[in-house]
Structure formats: C-alpha cells, structure tokens
Amino acid sequence: VDEEKLNAALAAEAAASNRKIIVLDDDPTGVQTVHDIYVYTNWTVESLRKGFAAPEKLFFILTNSRGFTVAETTKAHREIAENTAKVAREFGMDYLIISRGDSTLRGHYPLETDLLREVTEAENGYKMDGDILCPYFREGGRFTLDNVHYVRYGAELVPCGQTEFAKDETFG
C-alpha cells in the first residue's frame, strides 16, 4: 500500500466533507497518540460548539468511561449523543461518532455504542446499521491477523490471550 497516496486521498475526502468526526476515548491511551487536534475532557454543549467551530474535521472527547459504573457511562453517553446532535443541528453539519477503546474486556462495550446508536437514531430520524469493530492499534503494538488479536513484544507477535496481562486477574 502506498501510504503517501492513501493519506493524500483521505485528506482530500476530509477537506471536501461537511462532516465532523467526534472520537470518544474511554481512557487516555488513544489521545496520547494524536497531535494537532483538540481534546476535550467534557461533553458540554459549550465544548462541543468549540469542537464544531474549529477548522479541524475531527476532535476527541476523553470520557474516561472505562472507570465508570454502568449508571455513570449510561448517563454520560446519552448526554454526549444528545449534546452532539443539538450542536450539529446548530451548525448544520453531519457528524460521525467513533467510540475508541482498546479493551472490549475492561470497557463498557457494547453498552456505550448501543446508547450512542439509540440516541443518535432518535435525534436524527435515521437508522444505523451496526457497529464496526477495528481491532487495531498500531501505536500500542496491537494487530489482528487471520482473526487472532496479537500484541507486539519487540519483533514477536503474541496472541493477546497468551500475554501476561491476559493471565493477570487484577489487570481486568
């Protein structure tokens, strides 16, 4: 794959789009790997307005929801979806919410994406087809090949179920 050509094509599509991409991160891992974009630590209407007004096509919201209870994450994700729909209407923009987490075992999947879908469908009057799972985190050394998720240790790829973390009952 010609990475330079691919990046140029993606940049051209993003520039032509009237869509804002909002990435929700359930812990700080993801935001540690990005640059030149805004990262908000709340989802107030005021913060979302700043994100929608910014020229960048994408912004992050660090929810830290991995550490939330079910009740807390339910409240937070309903608020995020409602506030995002409200602000998008104000700006006359389409949007896409990406729920980014690097652990489906320790996070609130599928609760969070189900809530986002439920509220977004109700707010916007269209049906979403489902979730797209992308088990890939290059910066964290995590890859999926032939339906097996691996963690890179140096030059070696180890199936994640065989890592020290998978065996550590206090980790998850």
Regions found by a protein language model. Name each.
Residues 61-66:
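Short loop/turn segments at strand-loop or loop-helix junctions that form parts
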Residues 1-8, 40-43:
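Short coil-to-helix leader/linker segments, especially the first N-terminal amphipathic alpha-helix
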Residues 36-50:
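Short catalytic helix/loop segments, enriched in acidic residues and glycine
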Residues 6-11, 47-49:
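Short secondary-structure capping/turn segments at boundaries of alpha-helices and beta-strands
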Residues 11-25, 32-35, 51, 55-57, ...:
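Cap/lid and interdomain-hinge subdomains that line or gate substrate/regulatory clefts
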Residues 39, 58-60:
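Conserved beta-strand scaffold positions in the cores of enzyme catalytic domains, especially
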